[in-house]
């Protein structure tokens, strides 16, 4: 069940539904991820919205620009674009997989085929929860909801703790 607090956050930011519907109606997957999902569940207001999708950056730019939206490439190497809607901005990133050499803190980045692979690259389980606005459904393969409920912070993967050294 999706917490009412997350639904309230989405309701206060109607443009998120509009963008989600645009992607879904054009055959793409589209999920709210990261801190916005976590904060929405915890009833913390945020304006920092990140989405992940199977659309490439080129697909996103074409889709959004052809529908009158302004976009900026802010992280080509990460597959990330920024969408500006009025005074709001949203980051949209193509599903990706990060891999690390044993001695490196800098990931090798490649496209990923699915949402779960994308979620597995995130640092903590509480940041690895995705929300489908269209389906009104949470995706939580790493049990981040359980960690939120217990006040626990757990790494999604072994290397996460090494990236901030």
Language model: regions and residue ranges:
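Catalytic cores of the polymerase beta-like nucleotidyltransferase superfamily
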Residues: 1-162
